[in-house]
């Protein structure tokens, strides 16, 4: 388990604000059928490990509820789970390539969907208060079962939602300097691989000697 170094502790509040601001705009203001409230959690988890990611996700939802009186705290365990999975995928080197980063997002979304769907069905009566409620209502009209409707809504939205955010993380990481990324506990496992400079004729002559005719 990775320790929380100073840089990680400094990043966590920034990530929490990022989660809350984007999540509030997408789910509450725009009422889109997405969440997009985990980018900061994924960033911390991938760079600093499962513990830091889990704590960031958990605190994001608790603080969000304290600020806006939303239902976010009910899904705090889901947010923590996303951070833990991002940390595990980061530790295993999955987040250096776009293909496996996308797959990590889909797998995380499936796991999150099952947990979130059950929470929504049994604790909230199928209503989350966000932009996905319209989709839940559609499935409820089709199947007549709140549990089935909540699970189908989550399985429809979460894999896409987490795919978008993991891919966004992939490109975000590539916009940051490598010397900063490697200072995080898992930074070397997540940062883009270093590309060796091309060997020029001048370099060849300097290190090996002139070519023989």
List each model region and its residues.
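Loop-helix junctions at membrane interfaces
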Residues: 1-213
